[in-house]
UniProtKB/Swiss-Prot annotation:
The record marks D79 as: Transition state stabilizer. This is Uroporphyrinogen decarboxylase. It catalyses: uroporphyrinogen III + 4 H(+) = coproporphyrinogen III + 4 CO2. One of its GO terms (cellular component) is cytosol. The lineage of its organism: Bacteria, Bacillati, Actinomycetota, Actinomycetes, Mycobacteriales. InterPro entries: UROD/MetE-like_sf, Uroporphyrinogen_deCO2ase_HemE, Uroporphyrinogen_deCOase. It comes from Mycobacterium marinum (strain ATCC BAA-535 / M). The gene is hemE. It comes from the Bacteria. Catalyzes the decarboxylation of four acetate groups of uroporphyrinogen-III to yield coproporphyrinogen-III. Its EC number is 4.1.1.37.
Length: 353
């Protein structure tokens, strides 16, 4: 049973539910991370994966941007490969590379060897959620997971990939093996997110980081049914749900279909697509989130202010065009070299508009 809090004053929860917020809500993907000196100090004592599985550390890292930036939502400090690790997959997160899989999944036997999540393995993550719920006050907590397609790509490629060639080859040449893999990863994703919901997160976001590598037809055939099952299973719990990918302009309509009507749903938009255009592509009842280019934050305050004002204006046009609501965010994660002071000023600016 969920221990979700009642947060009627939250601008973020109002916007994603299609209500009028008291101000434009803002938070940032990767707001907790390498751009913060306090995070870098903590990471000198803990590896990335170790930090994800130590409740007090994960709680502290999640809280750091809340204290510094006064954003309208916290997002749990974790990583999309955490449920894979909890299922016994031998992997590591390598600095400046990303997740690296010791034994990539290439055969039916490899797929069969993937185990369900060990509940004890994710207990520290859920303990972190409970610590955060107690500490966050009126700030909502977003839980998250990677979408099945993106997890599959890491497993099949063995790590990050430019072209996702092995992934697409399995998908197209061995569809039975592919769907068996996706079924297992969908089960892992559901279990991981259900645990977070029961521990008290106020919303969830599913990151399909590599979905933009697919054509719309391939996305609908090989990825969407599995992501849709994730959202359908979670829908009964009533938490707002966000679906995000990079380079997904042509997929936005399909991504919005993954969450059925009757649930507060959001589609994240990257900087390549105008929010007003995105509003015309998504299903009715869908709120939008995004979409300042993270690189703009490196260009000096005049450029940041100009671009942020334009994004907020575009978000309002999107709502006028039919989007259910709007949340300011970046079009992808905060870059490590970003000046935290710029983010502090950006939050203040967005709140003033």
């Amino acid at each position: 049973m969920s221990t979700r809090r009642d947060l009627p004053q939250s601008p973020y929860l109002a916007a994603v539910a299609g209500r009028k917020p008291s101000r434009v809500p803002v938070w940032f993907m990767r707001q907790a991370g390498r751009s913060l000196p306090e995070y870098r100090a903590l990471r000198r004592q803990h590896s990335m994966l170790a930090a994800c599985f130590e409740p007090e550390v994960a709680c502290e890292v999640t809280m750091q941007p809340i204290r510094r930036y006064h954003v309208d939502a916290a997002i749990l400090f974790s990583d999309i490969v955490v449920p894979l690790r909890a299922a016994g997959v031998d992997l590591d997160i390598v600095a400046d590379v990303g997740p690296v899989i010791a034994a990539p999944v290439r055969t039916v036997a490899d797929v069969d060897a993937i185990k369900p999540i060990d509940p004890q393995s994710i207990a520290p993550v859920l303990d972190a959620v409970e610590l955060l719920v107690a500490e966050l006050g009126d700030t909502p907590l977003i839980g998250f997971a990677g979408a099945p397609f993106t997890l599959a790509s890491y497993l099949v490629e063995g790590g990050p990939s430019r072209h996702h060639a092995r992934t697409k080859a399995m998908m197209l040449a061995e569809p039975a093996t592919w769907h068996a893999l996706m079924t297992k990863l969908t089960d892992l994703t559901i279990e991981f997110l259900l645990g977070q919901i029961r521990a008290g997160v106020d919303a969830i976001q599913v990151f399909d980081s590599w979905a933009g590598m697919l054509s719309l037809a391939d996305y609908r055939q090989y990825a969407l049914p599995h992501s849709a099952r994730v959202f359908a299973t979670l829908a009964e719990h009533g938490v707002p749900m966000t679906h995000f990918g990079v380079g997904t302009a042509e997929l936005l309509g399909a991504m919005s279909e993954a969450v059925k009507p009757g649930t507060a749903k959001v589609v994240g938009v990257d900087w390549r697509t105008a929010l007003a255009d995105a509003a015309a592509r998504v299903q009715p009842g869908t709120a939008l989130q995004g979409n300042l280019d993270p690189v703009v934050l490196l260009a000096g305050w005049p450029a940041v202010e100009r671009a942020a004002r334009a994004v907020v204006d575009d978000g309002r046009r999107a709502v006028d065009a039919g989007a259910a609501g709007y949340v300011f965010n970046l079009g992808h994660g905060v870059l490590p070299q970003t000046d935290p002071g710029v983010l502090t000023d950006l939050v203040s600016l967005v709140h003033s508009l």
